[in-house]
Structures are given as structure tokens and as C-alpha cells.
């Protein structure tokens, strides 16, 4: 039974992997464009935030973004292979020492800043 599930997951990943998924990790600032359906119409909504965690689990791979808007912390969990996700773009590479940044949930303002990784920005330029 587990072999059937593995085969199914691999087939679905091949079908949905035509999108460009950049390499990123926790601490990076990402911009995600998602399709939003408002009744009859369809539009793109952009969410930009810091990646708090990334979970690599095949077809169920996901990551969580956090941003602060009007002094409110907003979190969004995004599945990598979801058909709703239109594009993922890395804005800034952050320098952190942890894989899961749960301590960031209680931080606001200057204390929530993440330093930029200079080694990754030089390679991209």
C-alpha cells in the first residue's frame, strides 16, 4: 500500500513541478503570488514575508511566512506544490542559525530584523 502512495505522490510531483521553485531556507524574505477566487473573478494576491520554517515532505512540502502589518503579526502556511501558488520569488537571503524560527513570533520592530547573507547575494549578482 505504501508503494502505491509513493508512486502516486511522485506522479503528482512531476505534474506540478513545472513551476520554478527557488532554493530558499528559513530566514529568507520571500514574495509569493497566489491565485484568489472571488466568486466569478480570479486575481493574483502577493504576500511578502520572512520564512519562519520549511518542511520538506515530498508532495506535502510546505513553508510558513510571517509579516507584520499594522502592528499585527500575520502568518501564512503555503504548500509548495499547491495549484493556487503562481510563483515564489526570493527577495533577500537572511543569515540565521536555526531551521525553525519560532522565537521570531514574539518579536516586533527592530528586534525582529534578520541580517542579510552576503555570500548568497554575490553569487546571484
From Swiss-Prot:
GO MF terms held by the record: structural constituent of ribosome
Alphabetical list of InterPro entries matching this protein: Ribosomal_bL19, Ribosomal_bL19_sf, Translation_prot_SH3-like_sf
Tree of life domain: Bacteria
GO BP: any one term: translation
Ligase keyword on record: no
Role noted for this protein: This protein is located at the 30S-50S ribosomal subunit interface and may play a role in the structure and function of the aminoacyl-tRNA binding site.
The family this protein is said to belong to: Belongs to the bacterial ribosomal protein bL19 family.
Name this protein carries in UniProt: Large ribosomal subunit protein bL19
Species of origin: Ehrlichia chaffeensis (strain ATCC CRL-10679 / Arkansas)
Amino acid at each position: 500500500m505504501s508503494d502505491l502512495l509513493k508512486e502516486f505522490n511522485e506522479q503528482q510531483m512531476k505534474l506540478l513541478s513545472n513551476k520554478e521553485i527557488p532554493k530558499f531556507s528559513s530566514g529568507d524574505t520571500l514574495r509569493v503570488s497566489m491565485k484568489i477566487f472571488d466568486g466569478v473573478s480570479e486575481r493574483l494576491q502577493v504576500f511578502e514575508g520572512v520564512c519562519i520554517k520549511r518542511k520538506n515532505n515530498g508532495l506535502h512540502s510546505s513553508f510558513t511566512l510571517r509579516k507584520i502589518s499594522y502592528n499585527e503579526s500575520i502568518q501564512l502556511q503555503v504548500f509548495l506544490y499547491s495549484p493556487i501558488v503562481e510563483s515564489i520569488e526570493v527577495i533577500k537571503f537572511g543569515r540565521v542559525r536555526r531551521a525553525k524560527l519560532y522565537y521570531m513570533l514574539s518579536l516586533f520592530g527592530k528586534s525582529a530584523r534578520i541580517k542579510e547573507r552576503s555570500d548568497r547575494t554575490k553569487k546571484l549578482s
